[in-house]
Amino acid sequence: MALGDLMASRLVHSSSSSAAPSAALPNHHTNHLVDDHLPVENGPDPRRDVPDEEPPPPPPPQVALLPQVVVLCEQRHEGFDEAAAAAAGPSTSGPVSKWRPKDRMKTGCVALVLCLNISVDPPDVIKISPCARKECWIDPFSMAPPKALETIGKTLHSQYERWQPKARYKLQLDPTLEEVKKLCNTCRKFARTERVLFHYNGHGVPKPTANGEIWVFNKSYTQYIPLPITDLDSWLKTPSIYVFDCSAAGMIVKAFLERLDWSSSSSASSSKDCILLAACEAHQTLPQSAEFPADVFTACLTTPIKMALHWFCNRSLLRDSMEHNLIDQIPGRQNDRKTLLGELNWIFTAITDTIAWNVLPHDLFQRLFRQDLLVASLFRNFLLAERIMRSANCSPISYPLLPPTHQHHMWDAWDMAAEICLSKLPQLIADPNAEFQPSPFFTEQLTAFEVWLDHGSEDKKPPEQLPIVLQVLLSQSHRFRALVLLGRFLDMGPWAVDLALSVGIFPYVLKLLQTSAMELRQILVFIWTKILSLDKSCQVDLVKDGGHAYFIRFLDSLDAYPEQRAMAAFVLAVIVDGHRIGQEACANAGLIDVCLRHLQPENPNDAQTEPLLLQWLCLCLGKLWEDFPEAQLLGLQSNAPEIVICLLSEPQPEVRASAVFALGNLVDIGSPSLNGADDDSDDDEKVRAEINVVRSLLQISSDGSPLVRSEVAVALTRFAMGHNKHIKSVAAEYWKPQTNSLLKSLPSLANINSSNVYSPSSLIQGSSGLASHIGPVLRVGSDNSATARDGRISTSSPIATNSIMHGSPQSDDSSQHSDSGILLRENASNGGLNYSRSRPIDNGIYSQFIATMCNVAKDPYPRIASIGKRALSLIGVEQVSMRNSRLSNGGAHPGETSVPPSSNFGMARSSSWFDMNSGNFSVAFRTPPVSPPQHDYLTGLRRVCSMEFRPHVLNSPDGLADPLLSSSAAPSNMGLYILPQSLIYRWSCGHFSRPLLTGSDDNEEANARREERERIAMDCIAKCQRSSCKMTSQIASWDTRFELGTKASLLLPFSPIVVAADENEQIRVWNYDDALPVNTFENHKLSDRGLSKLLLINELDDSLLLVGSSDGNVRIWRNYTQKGGQKLVTAFSSVQGYRSAGRSIVFDWQQQSGYLYASGDMSSILVWDLDKEQVNTIQSTADSGISALSASQVRCGQFAAGFLDASVRIFDVRTPDRLVYTARPHAPRSEKVVGIGFQPGFDPYKIVSASQAGDIQFLDVRRASEPYLTIEAHRGSLTALAVHRHAPVIASGSAKQMIKVFSLEGEQLTIIRYQPSFMGQRIGSVNCLSFHRYKSLLAAGAGDNALVSIYAEDNYQVR
């Protein structure tokens, strides 16, 4: 199968496909009861008159009870901090860059020295008869000695020239010492810094001396003159390579090594720049057998195919029928792979490369086989020399020393190829027109490589065929298959990419981008995706060779699969990443228009574009615009902001975050200016576009995904840098210190995030952002009708369209409860560094920005809060000590401590940064009063914060909180380095470094674990449905040691573990079978604390712990049962934007739909889709707030809500009206609904509701709104209700130290008052109750003694 088809069918990507977003919640989770809605309130219901009507047949138990939806398990939930992003993105240094030769080199000059002295044998050589005579395949005795010497010299020249035709060759025949010296000096002078090759044939002179001296002649050829190796080395210098073809050549190598060791202290690189090849060891003489030429070593190095075949001929089964002279008649050319000779040379190169790759260390392989073409050829041929000469008891040696290779099994493959060649040779010589049949060698090796791919892994030995795959890329007939297999190999991980690059694959795949073969496009894009996911440095080569145009054309082709085009967008993003030449080349090639064209569907009714493609189109644009004003201008001219802004509502967080990244890089961060002078280059169009971008970013600053919010915070910080001067000016106007002024009627920003939270979208509705931020409090001459039911700001308010109200701090006699505050340090206009655009934009945008960043600084996700604090410090807003006063009906929240009044004075410089442990940031807005404050606006206000500004020394000349921003402490470009870094690009790169073609083994393990848990769950459900449910036995009691008692508890379904938490949001995990603590951690480190609920997500898989805080913040943890191993998966504010939500937010979770429901003292219910990490709002249509929520475990999108006015409502997100049932089951005197739940089993029509007055009402929504059963469980003070998911039992608890367990028929099964001890101590006031999901177990948390008790039936057995 082609890799393109394989990718289409098996490609795995992190972005999930879903339908286009709509205003209403889509029914994207199909359910078995999707069309069977509950009757609408007061609507006709024929079933009400048929009391005994049987409910519809239940669905299969496993479908209804064991939901298949899994959320928050994408790669983004594994973490996207700086460390994760750095590990995911392409590298430009370190181990991955070692594949690229640091100093490519070529041999520029070759010195050939032949000391043959034909017809005169050296005195220390005794020759046998017959003996080896041929030199360069020429018999020197077949012609006159001078002619023979000249012919041999020219032949050696031609043999070397085939390997390096561009080098300069110098030949010396039987030279003197002076001639050799002159030759060496000339070669070095010509070669300069290039390598010089010195070839020495000493067959006509004595062996080298013990000191490593070689011999030459005197002028009259009457004496042998020694040439010290030290002199030779000093003439040739380095880099150089020596070939010594003489007996006892090892003596020369030994002397060289001694010299290198001696000189290593002065020249560390000399040993690496000197390469030696010697024919034999110091004690050996050259072979004299007549089957070899006299210069067998030289023959192997310069004519390997001929030498190999001659040698093999005598050992082949064909030796009797083969004539040696036919070897010289092999048809074809060595550089033509479609001929017999060319194919043999190709196979030989592949085999010797493979042997070297598998035997040598990779750095040595790189140096010898990839740095210099001539050196690589000589070392390939040296491997042949070792094989042939060792058969004659002669061992060639080299420096660097190579391990033995003469018995490597790949030589068997060569022998087979040679034998096939020899068998064809007679026929081809007899019939020159005979059709050439290629060798099966490469086909077989590719098959072997494919077998390895089916069974290999990183932990096993690397595939030895990898160098052969590289060679196969040269052949058009094998290329496609080789590329597909190479793609499969690269997909195995970064280690595979590094191996392929180390073997030398890069120049081959780079060259292939110049081909126009359509069938190669998909696989080449995939291969380049894998390469660039490891090493970014290849971007330079791609642009240099024009490769970027190849990927732009592919990206613009509609016939390719979207996933493949996403890969092309990734490649282009890497090309332009921090590479100005690449940015310019891609911009000139029209990349911006191509990306924008594919970001918007041609037809609005078309299905959603592949999310991965959208993500990488945005990232590509963002990288192209990054720090490149010319490209930014092109984007603005192409209406890029409008197009990209449309993606901010996409269902995939990765797409939204990437769109924010692209928009953020269109925001001008300004340029350093020492005098703050304006630059007239900005035009109105750019200003309007930037306003549009910033407004859009402010609107999504409370997105449900930290990935998105993080990018928004980074982009807004860039905006703060670009508009630093103007934002400071606006902030200074509002926060100008006024001595002894009184601030009245102003809420703190801490309250704005808790009881008075505003959404950025509501801020943008008014022209004055800060005014709208505090509008309900500061509004003058208006009434409460200016505020909408859901707490959002009405633009009809006069204050919402005018300047900010003002006031002064209250006196020191106010409440002593402390809070954290923000102070703006005025900018001293001293010519210091200011990063700012030339022209200010609307001050309302600046005000909205400040208010939004104050909320960002309190984000529940730590990294985002840190960015928000940094952005505020950029505009000179810093923390100061605050004191807030409460109204008579208010009070301190848990976790707030008191400070003395003097804490406002003399603030130390170190306090200029926000306190990382503080969650309350209160701001006093100050402007001259327009009219007296109206006391009407204080009605209902929970807190009023006051801030007193005290004079203190400003150590920073420009008023910035960070000394790094001071002009006296930073260079002119320091501001560029303090901007927080976006992580989305590098984090997204990690997707392509992971396997894309095969599923992970982890998925198989997870599936097996889930199947086992499903089996256990079904068994437990069947048992608990038949149990008596009398919780009479206390099987465990745990003193949690919570200071404020236990607020929530949760029993895990598949392990004997209970999780408990208190009002301070301390989370503790306990094993109740072993009575041992498992883990303890804090939900957060902020001072503003309060817990609402613990929920379990993905209970059948790797479960996650959701901790809902009473202020609406949600944090979700994984690994919470590992001591110290808990990790934050995601965090968000569930009620951001709702001023009246209060601190009593309630939650419930529905696994079937992936929805989290949240509400409180507000008129809306927030439905969070945790798959998309987006929210939709349902109006409750009630006059009071919500006090309890319960999601149906049978029907997706259906949930029940209990209200503060004791009413009950059922909602279904699938119906147009949402509200499907309303009832007031509790008496008018009753207080709020404390607990509500759907009754156990498959019947979705029955619910249970308990009020604080103590009554429990059973309702059947198919009948009248009156309850069909009432239980007076407690006489007031009911604090908790628990409904078992499967067993027919409910439990209630009261503050009067009592727990009661009832059947669904109202029978009281158990009453628990005392601990099962000798003294019979009372159990304590009940704060929380929770049933085990699949067993008859009940956990109860006490409020006064912090005990968590677990109750079971009498026959419960501890494992």
UniProtKB/Swiss-Prot annotation:
Residues 806-819 have a biased composition (Low complexity). SUPFAM superfamilies: ARM repeat (SSF48371), WD40 repeat-like (SSF50978). GO terms for biological process: cellular response to amino acid stimulus; cellular response to starvation; positive regulation of cell growth; regulation of autophagy; TOR signaling. WD repeats lie at residues 1041-1080, 1087-1127, 1139-1178, 1181-1221, 1228-1269, 1273-1312, 1321-1359. Residues 17-64, 782-819 are annotated as: Disordered. GO terms for molecular function: protein-macromolecule adaptor activity. Residues 782-805 have a biased composition (Polar residues). GO terms for cellular component: cytoplasm; TORC1 complex. The keyword Repeat applies. Residues 32-50 have a biased composition (Basic and acidic residues). Transmembrane segments: none annotated. Gene3D superfamilies: Leucine-rich Repeat Variant (1.25.10.10), YVTN repeat-like/Quinoprotein amine dehydrogenase (2.130.10.10). The keyword 4Fe-4S does not apply. Keywords: Developmental protein, Growth regulation, Repeat, WD repeat. It holds the Pfam family Raptor_N. InterPro entries: ARM-like, ARM-type_fold, Raptor, Raptor_N, WD40/YVTN_repeat-like_dom_sf, WD40_repeat_dom_sf, WD40_rpt. Belongs to the WD repeat RAPTOR family. Component of TORC1 complex, which is an essential cell growth regulator that controls plant development. Acts by recruiting substrates for TOR. Acts by activating transcription, protein synthesis and ribosome biogenesis, and inhibiting mRNA degradation and autophagy. The target of rapamycin complex 1 (TORC1) is composed of at least RAPTOR, LST8 and TOR. PANTHER family: REGULATORY-ASSOCIATED PROTEIN OF MTOR (PTHR12848:SF16). This is Regulatory-associated protein of TOR 2. The gene is RAPTOR2.
